[in-house]
Amino acid sequence: MRILISNDDGIFAEGINTLATVLSELGEVTIVAPDRNRSGASNSLTLDYPLRIREEGDRRISVDGTPTDCVHFALNEWLDYRPDIVVAGINHGANLGDDVLYSGTVAAATEGHFLGVPAIAISLVGSTHFDTAAQVVKSIVVNLLEKPLPKNKILNINVPDIPFAELKGWKVTRLGARHRAEQMVKDVDPRGKVLYWLGPPGACQDAGPGTDFHAVEQNLVSITPLQVDLTAHDALESVELWMNEVGKK
Protein backbone atom coordinates (compact mmCIF):
# COMPACT_ATOMS: atom_id res chain seq x y z
CA MET A 1 0.00 0.00 0.00
CA ARG A 2 1.20 3.50 -0.84
CA ILE A 3 0.11 6.36 1.39
CA LEU A 4 0.62 10.11 0.94
CA ILE A 5 0.55 12.15 4.14
CA SER A 6 0.29 15.92 4.53
CA ASN A 7 -0.90 18.38 7.18
CA ASP A 8 -1.12 22.06 8.05
CA ASP A 9 0.98 22.07 11.23
CA GLY A 10 4.21 21.57 9.30
CA ILE A 11 6.50 18.68 8.48
CA PHE A 12 8.19 18.68 11.89
CA ALA A 13 4.95 18.53 13.90
CA GLU A 14 4.46 15.65 16.31
CA GLY A 15 1.13 14.67 14.82
CA ILE A 16 2.29 13.98 11.28
CA ASN A 17 5.38 12.12 12.44
CA THR A 18 3.42 9.88 14.81
CA LEU A 19 0.99 9.19 11.97
CA ALA A 20 3.79 8.32 9.56
CA THR A 21 5.38 5.90 12.02
CA VAL A 22 2.14 3.99 12.56
CA LEU A 23 1.00 3.95 8.93
CA SER A 24 4.42 2.73 7.78
CA GLU A 25 3.35 -0.61 9.26
CA LEU A 26 0.84 -0.82 6.39
CA GLY A 27 3.11 0.07 3.49
CA GLU A 28 5.13 2.84 1.88
CA VAL A 29 4.55 6.29 3.35
CA THR A 30 5.53 9.57 1.70
CA ILE A 31 5.28 12.87 3.55
CA VAL A 32 4.85 16.09 1.59
CA ALA A 33 4.00 18.86 4.03
CA PRO A 34 4.50 22.59 4.64
CA ASP A 35 7.88 23.71 5.90
CA ARG A 36 6.18 25.55 8.78
CA ASN A 37 2.82 25.92 10.45
CA ARG A 38 0.10 26.78 7.94
CA SER A 39 -2.95 26.33 10.14
CA GLY A 40 -6.02 28.14 8.83
CA ALA A 41 -4.79 28.16 5.23
CA SER A 42 -7.99 26.50 4.02
CA ASN A 43 -7.90 25.60 0.30
CA SER A 44 -5.55 28.39 -0.71
CA LEU A 45 -2.99 27.89 -3.47
CA THR A 46 0.24 29.87 -3.85
CA LEU A 47 0.02 31.77 -7.13
CA ASP A 48 2.28 34.80 -6.65
CA TYR A 49 5.63 33.08 -6.21
CA PRO A 50 7.20 29.70 -7.11
CA LEU A 51 7.25 26.87 -4.62
CA ARG A 52 10.55 25.73 -3.18
CA ILE A 53 11.00 22.23 -1.85
CA ARG A 54 13.51 20.56 0.40
CA GLU A 55 14.20 16.89 1.00
CA GLU A 56 14.11 16.38 4.76
CA GLY A 57 14.86 12.66 4.67
CA ASP A 58 13.77 9.49 2.92
CA ARG A 59 10.40 10.17 1.28
CA ARG A 60 10.02 13.38 3.32
CA ILE A 61 9.56 16.63 1.40
CA SER A 62 8.91 20.09 2.84
CA VAL A 63 7.28 22.76 0.70
CA ASP A 64 7.22 26.51 1.35
CA GLY A 65 3.54 26.58 0.51
CA THR A 66 0.09 25.72 1.77
CA PRO A 67 -1.27 22.24 2.51
CA THR A 68 -3.16 22.36 -0.79
CA ASP A 69 0.08 23.26 -2.58
CA CYS A 70 1.74 20.24 -0.97
CA VAL A 71 -0.81 17.68 -2.11
CA HIS A 72 -1.11 19.32 -5.54
CA PHE A 73 2.66 19.18 -5.98
CA ALA A 74 2.95 15.62 -4.71
CA LEU A 75 0.26 14.19 -6.97
CA ASN A 76 0.98 16.23 -10.09
CA GLU A 77 4.77 16.35 -10.01
CA TRP A 78 6.72 14.59 -7.29
CA LEU A 79 5.23 11.10 -7.23
CA ASP A 80 5.51 8.88 -10.28
CA TYR A 81 2.52 6.82 -9.15
CA ARG A 82 -0.95 7.36 -7.71
CA PRO A 83 -1.07 6.62 -3.98
CA ASP A 84 -3.85 4.46 -2.63
CA ILE A 85 -4.95 7.14 -0.18
CA VAL A 86 -4.18 10.65 1.03
CA VAL A 87 -4.21 11.04 4.81
CA ALA A 88 -4.12 14.59 6.21
CA GLY A 89 -3.10 15.07 9.83
CA ILE A 90 -2.82 14.37 12.61
CA ASN A 91 -4.00 17.92 13.23
CA HIS A 92 -2.99 19.52 16.52
CA GLY A 93 -6.48 20.40 17.70
CA ALA A 94 -10.05 19.75 16.63
CA ASN A 95 -11.59 20.38 13.24
CA LEU A 96 -15.22 20.37 14.30
CA GLY A 97 -18.23 22.12 12.81
CA ASP A 98 -17.40 25.16 10.71
CA ASP A 99 -13.69 24.72 11.54
CA VAL A 100 -13.58 22.67 8.34
CA LEU A 101 -14.05 25.83 6.25
CA TYR A 102 -10.73 27.20 7.51
CA SER A 103 -8.77 24.01 8.09
CA GLY A 104 -5.65 23.39 6.06
CA THR A 105 -5.78 19.76 7.17
CA VAL A 106 -9.23 19.25 5.68
CA ALA A 107 -8.08 21.20 2.62
CA ALA A 108 -5.17 18.80 2.07
CA ALA A 109 -7.62 15.90 2.04
CA THR A 110 -9.93 17.86 -0.25
CA GLU A 111 -7.12 18.41 -2.77
CA GLY A 112 -6.38 14.70 -2.80
CA HIS A 113 -10.05 14.07 -3.48
CA PHE A 114 -10.08 16.72 -6.25
CA LEU A 115 -7.20 14.89 -7.91
CA GLY A 116 -8.89 11.52 -7.81
CA VAL A 117 -7.38 9.88 -4.72
CA PRO A 118 -9.44 8.68 -1.72
CA ALA A 119 -8.76 11.00 1.19
CA ILE A 120 -9.36 11.38 4.91
CA ALA A 121 -8.55 14.13 7.41
CA ILE A 122 -7.70 13.27 11.01
CA SER A 123 -7.59 15.65 13.98
CA LEU A 124 -6.83 15.17 17.66
CA VAL A 125 -9.07 17.17 19.98
CA GLY A 126 -6.06 18.22 22.03
CA SER A 127 -2.30 17.84 21.84
CA THR A 128 -1.31 14.81 23.90
CA HIS A 129 -2.51 11.39 22.68
CA PHE A 130 -1.38 11.43 19.07
CA ASP A 131 -0.82 7.68 19.35
CA THR A 132 -4.57 7.24 19.91
CA ALA A 133 -5.43 9.15 16.74
CA ALA A 134 -2.80 7.25 14.76
CA GLN A 135 -4.23 3.89 15.83
CA VAL A 136 -7.71 5.04 14.85
CA VAL A 137 -6.47 6.05 11.40
CA LYS A 138 -4.61 2.79 10.96
CA SER A 139 -7.79 0.83 11.64
CA ILE A 140 -9.79 2.95 9.19
CA VAL A 141 -7.19 2.69 6.44
CA VAL A 142 -7.04 -1.11 6.83
CA ASN A 143 -10.81 -1.26 6.40
CA LEU A 144 -10.67 1.05 3.39
CA LEU A 145 -8.51 -1.54 1.64
CA GLU A 146 -11.43 -3.96 1.76
CA LYS A 147 -14.24 -1.46 1.23
CA PRO A 148 -13.39 1.88 -0.43
CA LEU A 149 -14.82 5.21 0.61
CA PRO A 150 -18.25 6.18 -0.74
CA LYS A 151 -17.85 7.95 -4.07
CA ASN A 152 -17.20 11.69 -3.89
CA LYS A 153 -16.90 11.70 -0.10
CA ILE A 154 -14.09 12.74 2.25
CA LEU A 155 -14.00 11.56 5.85
CA ASN A 156 -13.33 14.18 8.51
CA ILE A 157 -12.30 12.34 11.67
CA ASN A 158 -11.94 13.86 15.14
CA VAL A 159 -10.45 11.80 17.96
CA PRO A 160 -10.83 12.61 21.68
CA ASP A 161 -7.53 13.34 23.40
CA ILE A 162 -7.56 10.27 25.66
CA PRO A 163 -5.76 6.92 25.77
CA PHE A 164 -6.92 4.50 23.06
CA ALA A 165 -8.34 2.08 25.63
CA GLU A 166 -10.68 4.78 26.96
CA LEU A 167 -12.42 5.43 23.64
CA LYS A 168 -16.11 4.50 23.76
CA GLY A 169 -16.32 3.65 20.07
CA TRP A 170 -17.17 5.75 17.03
CA LYS A 171 -20.10 7.75 15.72
CA VAL A 172 -20.98 8.92 12.22
CA THR A 173 -21.92 12.57 12.68
CA ARG A 174 -22.92 15.77 10.97
CA LEU A 175 -21.02 19.02 11.37
CA GLY A 176 -22.08 21.14 14.30
CA ALA A 177 -21.49 24.89 14.46
CA ARG A 178 -19.86 27.55 16.59
CA HIS A 179 -20.99 31.04 17.52
CA ARG A 180 -19.34 33.70 15.42
CA ALA A 181 -15.81 34.58 16.47
CA GLU A 182 -15.84 38.36 16.75
CA GLN A 183 -13.01 39.13 19.14
CA MET A 184 -9.80 40.69 17.86
CA VAL A 185 -6.79 41.12 20.14
CA LYS A 186 -5.07 44.50 19.82
CA ASP A 187 -1.39 44.79 20.71
CA VAL A 188 1.60 47.04 20.18
CA ASP A 189 4.97 45.84 18.90
CA PRO A 190 8.34 46.96 20.40
CA ARG A 191 8.50 49.83 17.89
CA GLY A 192 5.12 51.17 18.91
CA LYS A 193 3.22 49.92 15.89
CA VAL A 194 -0.31 48.69 16.49
CA LEU A 195 -1.02 45.11 15.47
CA TYR A 196 -3.95 42.73 15.72
CA TRP A 197 -4.33 39.03 16.40
CA LEU A 198 -7.35 36.98 15.46
CA GLY A 199 -9.17 36.00 18.63
CA PRO A 200 -10.21 32.52 19.76
CA PRO A 201 -12.91 30.59 17.90
CA GLY A 202 -16.51 31.01 18.96
CA ALA A 203 -18.09 28.76 21.56
CA CYS A 204 -20.21 25.80 20.48
CA GLN A 205 -23.66 26.76 19.23
CA ASP A 206 -25.03 23.67 17.49
CA ALA A 207 -23.51 20.83 19.52
CA GLY A 208 -26.39 18.51 20.32
CA PRO A 209 -26.75 14.77 19.71
CA GLY A 210 -25.74 13.76 16.22
CA THR A 211 -23.08 16.44 15.87
CA ASP A 212 -19.34 16.00 15.83
CA PHE A 213 -19.03 18.18 18.94
CA HIS A 214 -21.36 15.92 20.90
CA ALA A 215 -19.59 12.73 19.82
CA VAL A 216 -16.14 13.76 21.03
CA GLU A 217 -17.63 15.00 24.31
CA GLN A 218 -18.89 11.44 24.80
CA ASN A 219 -15.37 10.07 24.14
CA LEU A 220 -16.48 8.78 20.75
CA VAL A 221 -14.48 9.11 17.54
CA SER A 222 -16.45 11.44 15.28
CA ILE A 223 -16.55 10.48 11.59
CA THR A 224 -18.19 13.06 9.33
CA PRO A 225 -18.56 12.47 5.58
CA LEU A 226 -17.87 15.67 3.64
CA GLN A 227 -18.55 16.56 0.03
CA VAL A 228 -17.00 19.16 -2.24
CA ASP A 229 -20.20 20.17 -4.06
CA LEU A 230 -21.28 23.39 -2.31
CA THR A 231 -24.45 23.78 -4.36
CA ALA A 232 -27.52 24.36 -2.17
CA HIS A 233 -29.59 21.83 -4.09
CA ASP A 234 -32.65 22.30 -1.87
CA ALA A 235 -32.67 26.01 -2.76
CA LEU A 236 -32.49 25.72 -6.55
CA GLU A 237 -36.25 25.82 -7.05
CA SER A 238 -36.89 28.69 -4.63
CA VAL A 239 -34.07 30.78 -6.11
CA GLU A 240 -35.42 30.17 -9.61
CA LEU A 241 -38.87 31.35 -8.50
CA TRP A 242 -37.28 34.41 -6.90
CA MET A 243 -35.34 35.21 -10.07
CA ASN A 244 -38.50 34.88 -12.15
CA GLU A 245 -40.12 37.50 -9.92
CA VAL A 246 -37.06 39.75 -10.01
CA GLY A 247 -36.93 39.47 -13.79
CA LYS A 248 -40.41 40.94 -14.11
CA LYS A 249 -39.38 44.22 -12.47
UniProtKB/Swiss-Prot annotation:
GO MF annotation, one: exopolyphosphatase activity
Cofactor note: Binds 1 divalent metal cation per subunit.
Keyword Nucleus among UniProt keywords: no
Cellular location(s): Cytoplasm
Enzyme Commission (EC) number: 3.1.3.5
Cofactor(s) essential for the protein: a divalent metal cation
Catalytic activity: a ribonucleoside 5'-phosphate + H2O = a ribonucleoside + phosphate
Keywords: Cytoplasm, Hydrolase, Metal-binding, Nucleotide-binding
InterPro entries documented for this protein: SurE, SurE-like_Pase/nucleotidase, SurE-like_sf
Gene3D superfamilies named in the record: Survival protein SurE-like phosphatase/nucleotidase
Positions with a binding annotation for a divalent metal cation: D8, D9, S39, N91
SUPFAM superfamilies the UniProt entry points to: SurE-like
Enzyme class, spelled out: hydrolase
GO cellular component, one term: cytoplasm
Function: Nucleotidase that shows phosphatase activity on nucleoside 5'-monophosphates.
Family of the protein in this entry: Belongs to the SurE nucleotidase family.
Protein name per UniProt: 5'-nucleotidase SurE
Biological source species: Photobacterium profundum (strain SS9)
Gene name, Swiss-Prot/TrEMBL: surE
